[in-house]
A protein has these predicted regions:
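N-terminal Rossmann NAD(P)H-binding glycine-rich loop of SDR-like oxidoreductase domains
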Residues: 23-42
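Conserved Rossmann-fold NAD(P)-dependent oxidoreductase catalytic core, especially the SDR/UDP-sugar
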Residues: 98-146, 156, 162
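Conserved beta-loop-beta element that borders a ligand/cofactor-binding pocket
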Residues: 151-173
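Substrate-binding strand-loop-helix patch
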Residues: 173, 201-208, 227-247, 289, ...
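Alpha-helical substrate-binding/gating segment
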Residues: 183-192, 200-235
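Mid/C-terminal beta-alpha module of Rossmann-like enzyme folds, strongest
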Residues: 216-267, 272-273, 312-325
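Conserved C-terminal active-site "lid" loop/helix of NAD(P)H-dependent oxidoreductases
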Residues: 261-287, 293, 304-308
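Amphipathic terminal alpha-helices
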Residues: 291-325
Length: 325
């Protein structure tokens, strides 16, 4: 369904004895935004996805076909219980969407922005907490600073908005070449090339747990406005790879890589260890999906959607540069 301009819609439609929330999800066609759109649609919400219609649309949703930077009046005829902004990476992304929503009438009740743990400078003591100052992180560069500016732009115009800062997201629909890279190695029986001793720590968060956090915010409207979200426990690279191999029914064998200038050439994470303090998250959810369980879900999706993964040249680099070492 493509939305056209028309009479201004009412928020919270009464249907079959209950109110159905109207949710606007930016994106909706790839990994996180698609999972979120489908998650809330399955819950019975009326989910509207805002994108340019270049990819298949998520199930049980309504399409608003538009570029968020050139919205015209298409959203000014709509009202939503919540805007779930999954695809804002810059201040302009936020400002253009808010301009498109309009200010003449209150067009939404809640606004939830998915930001990132990349907003914390690497020089701060870890784990990073929401009360620490944000700033440039040398590892994340413009990605992190742009997310900071997006947060600032939002709070300037919508002081009661909510911001979630996750670490590495994973789960079904993940087309980013992370767990899928390890699954590729496992399925092909490759020795895994491990950065140094493999003790670098990684922090993950299942995309369904992210949805649960959003759901809690919309239901309870907590007083805090910024939440770090993520699994409480970090795992080493080695532990994570072993879990991925075991999920694929294999046992990992390792080669240790030393002296390569950039591990990004052959591995799916930067040489950077960070951890978020997720104590405040307990106000939203009290448990998270165990990593082993989440990876099983991710592997099942991967097995049926290998062609949807955006692969990088890690295996080619390993074959050409590392196997002969």
């Amino acid at each position: 369904m493509t939305i056209k301009s028309g009479a201004k819609a009412f928020v919270s439609v009464w249907k079959e004895g209950m109110y159905v929330r109207r949710l606007l999800v930016t994106g909706g066609t790839v990994f996180v935004s698609r999972f979120i759109a489908e998650y809330f649609a399955k819950k019975g919400d009326a989910v509207y996805v805002l994108n340019r219609n270049h990819r298949p649309q998520p199930a049980q949703t309504r399409l608003i076909e538009a570029d968020r930077h050139h919205l015209g009046d298409i959203l000014k005829q709509q009202s939503f219980d919540a805007v779930l902004d999954i695809t804002a990476y810059t201040a302009k992304d936020v400002d253009d969407l808010l301009d498109g929503l309009g200010t003449l009438h209150r067009s939404f009740q809640d606004y939830v922005l998915i930001s990132s743990g990349a907003v914390y400078p690497e020089t701060l003591p870890r784990p990073f907490s929401e009360t620490q100052q944000t700033g440039e992180n040398q590892c994340w560069g413009a990605y992190g600073t742009n997310k900071i500016e997006a947060e600032k732009a939002l709070f300037k115009r919508v002081p009661n908005a909510y911001v979630l800062r996750p670490p590495y997201l994973y789960g079904p629909l993940n087309n980013v070449y992370r767990e899928a890279f390890v699954f590729d190695c496992a399925d092909s029986g490759h020795t895994f090339y491990l950065p140094r001793n493999g003790e670098m720590k990684l922090q993950f968060f299942h995309v369904r747990d992210l949805c649960r956090c959003i759901e809690a915010i919309l239901a309870h409207h907590p007083s805090e406005r910024i939440y770090n979200v993520g699994n409480e426990t970090c795992v080493s690279v080695r532990e994570w790879v072993e879990l991925c191999y075991r999920t694929a029914g294999r046992t990992a064998e390792f080669a240790h890589v030393h002296g390569v200038r950039s591990q990004w050439e052959y591995f799916c994470f930067h040489d950077y260890e960070y951890q978020l303090d997720v104590t405040r998250q307990s106000e939203l959810i009290t448990d998270t999906i165990p990593l082993e369980e989440g990876l099983r879900e991710a592997y099942l999706w991967y097995c049926g959607h290998k062609e949807e993964v955006n692969r990088k040249g890690y295996l080619a680099y390993i074959d050409e540069q590392l196997r002969a070492i």
